[in-house]
């Protein structure tokens, strides 16, 4: 994998990705692609990006040896890449800082975003406040109900939260609505996509901004243990935290890469959000081609996950490509496994993880005991779980 290069000039990762949008959006995406290409080759752009990550986000985020959890499980040593310690509480802000700097460079005064768990909405509202832009966040009505703390947070930050009542009233529908709005106001509006999906150049751009995770982790693990981990694992919805960890490791052939999809109630039921593990066919959604949960007529299927942030029927195109070329293994953690991992991390390490990240922790919980004590698993702890305490309390029958 030493010579891995993707996407190609048309925005394809193998047979995934590309640009499947209405004519009206082509000029906007071309303008964005040109602006990003120029920014990518401008050292000053990256200097400003790094400066904000350091002084505003609080990077680098540490790697932490979860020694008590490792001892309890009795096997491999579990290390956590602590994205939960970033300003706003998750990895999302790495990307919103980058896109906001690009919006500023392009002279856009307004940003819009879609959000599922609310973390990307909060991160977008945060950077809009930071750079003096107006912000509208599109969010499915169901997600608004299960993520009230984040909805209030966005409003505190000055954003307008637009509830989406159409379809399944979740992330997919919020993304549809945001794209419609972008078509209508493309001149003054920048659309900050929150995951490594969407039409080109978004998957590449989001990956590049999130690669700070894996680049830091490589240097930090080398310093901490004198080598790289045996396995690097991350949860995958659209897949931005995972691609940020995986991409810098693609050339490290001794490092196994594992992406954990949302298994929901099981991939043998309709209630999950695991397109790759469930063997979903290729389809087109939100401007890109990738594995997509759909019925025999090509209608997008409903999804289920205990975590709002993984509740998405598609997956970023680069993940589909990495699956095709067998560089990354994709598997699932079910709701109950994620909840068990959530409890274990709380009790053994004093860290409340996001339910999304708990899916990656669940892989470590399941697999560490089968590995040697000298082996190392690096888990991307993509976010903190404050936003999820209502969901968890409800599932435990506790009224807050």
Swiss-Prot record:
Pathway: Amino-acid biosynthesis; L-tryptophan biosynthesis; L-tryptophan from chorismate: step 5/5. The modification N6-(pyridoxal phosphate)lysine is found at residue 92. It comes from the Bacteria. Signal peptide: none annotated. The keyword Lyase applies. GO terms for molecular function: tryptophan synthase activity. The keyword Transcription does not apply. Pfam families: PALP. It catalyses: (1S,2R)-1-C-(indol-3-yl)glycerol 3-phosphate + L-serine = D-glyceraldehyde 3-phosphate + L-tryptophan + H2O. CDD domains: Trp-synth_B (cd06446). Belongs to the TrpB family. The beta subunit is responsible for the synthesis of L-tryptophan from indole and L-serine. This is Tryptophan synthase beta chain. The gene is trpB.
């Amino acid at each position: 994998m030493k010579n891995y290069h993707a996407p190609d000039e048309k925005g394809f990762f193998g047979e995934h990705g590309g640009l499947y949008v209405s004519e009206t959006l082509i000029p906007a995406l071309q303008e964005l692609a040109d602006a990003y290409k120029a920014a990518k080759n401008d050292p000053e752009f990256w200097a400003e990006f790094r400066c904000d990550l350091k002084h505003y986000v609080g990077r680098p985020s540490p790697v932490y040896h979860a020694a008590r959890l490792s001892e309890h499980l009795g096997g491999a040593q579990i290390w956590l890449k602590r994205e939960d310690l970033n300003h706003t509480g998750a990895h999302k802000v790495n990307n919103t800082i980058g896109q906001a700097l690009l919006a500023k460079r392009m002279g856009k005064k307004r940003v819009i975003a879609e959000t599922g768990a609310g973390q990307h909405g909060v991160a977008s509202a945060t950077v809009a406040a930071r750079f003096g832009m107006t912000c509208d966040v599109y969010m499915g009505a169901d997600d608004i109900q299960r993520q009230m703390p984040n909805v209030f947070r966005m409003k505190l930050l000055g954003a307008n939260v637009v509830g989406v009542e159409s379809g399944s009233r979740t992330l997919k529908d919020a993304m549809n609505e945001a794209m419609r709005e972008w078509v209508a106001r493309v001149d003054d509006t920048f659309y900050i996509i929150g995951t490594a999906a969407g039409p080109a150049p978004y998957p590449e751009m989001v990956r590049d901004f999130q690669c700070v995770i894996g680049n830091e982790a490589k240097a930090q693990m080398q310093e901490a243990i004198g080598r790289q981990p045996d396995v690097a694992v991350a949860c995958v919805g659209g897949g931005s935290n995972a691609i940020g960890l995986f991409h810098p490791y693609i050339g490290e052939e001794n490092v196994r890469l594992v992406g954990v999809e949302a298994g929901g109630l099981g991939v043998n039921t309709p209630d999950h959000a695991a397109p790759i593990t469930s063997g979903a066919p290729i389809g087109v959604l939100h401007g890109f081609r990738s594995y997509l949960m759909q019925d025999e007529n090509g209608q997008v299927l409903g999804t289920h996950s205990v975590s709002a942030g993984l509740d998405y029927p598609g997956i970023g195109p680069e993940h589909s490509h990495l699956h095709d070329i067998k560089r990354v293994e994709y598997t699932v953690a079910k709701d109950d496994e994620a909840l068990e991992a959530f409890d274990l991390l709380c009790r053994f390490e004093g860290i409340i993880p996001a339910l999304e990240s708990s899916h990656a922790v669940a892989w470590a919980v399941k697999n560490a005991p089968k590995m040697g004590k000298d082996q190392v698993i690096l888990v991307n702890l993509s976010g903190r779980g404050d936003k999820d305490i209502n969901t968890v309390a409800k599932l435990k029958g506790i009224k807050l």
